[in-house]
């Protein structure tokens, strides 16, 4: 079957399509094994110190592991890329007929904190990914925004609906006790300095250069 990469990524994000994950791995790196190695290397670049991938879909393997902190680092990197940030916020997607499917397929997301009709809906949640295996229980990565502050919550080894209720409790605590504060404004650190060149012990003015940070700094 022929699908676009964007369609396959939606199948992975919304429906945890394991075969789609394997397909992407083979497309990108030639094999699942090579892709898993690639993922592990990239995770280390992001600062992950307790993560090792051996497959592309997250199914159980004793040598396939991570931590809540490492998953948060990976999620933080994803948020920097608008195209993936947008995909993670979607709750529904349609895949039109393909060379092997004659009917449109409708994908509905499983993350209940993004679903306005769910009792677990969290109005500030703007994206995330569910996960489940027998060994790991329910796992959940979610990010939410309020008043300019973005928080990422990762929960693991949850039973029943604990992954939703625990995530909501952590968000409530975070938004109640933390705020995004501007610690440096571009205007405060902008300076115009003269540029000169010395020739035969004489300074010649060449002009002026304005130096400033690229953006305000928040903490």
Task: List where the protein language model places each region.
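Domain-terminus/edge residues, biased toward the C-terminal soluble/receptor-binding domains
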Residues: 48-49, 63-65, 69-219
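Active-site-adjacent loops and short helices of periplasmic peptidoglycan-processing enzymes
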Residues: 1-69, 73-82
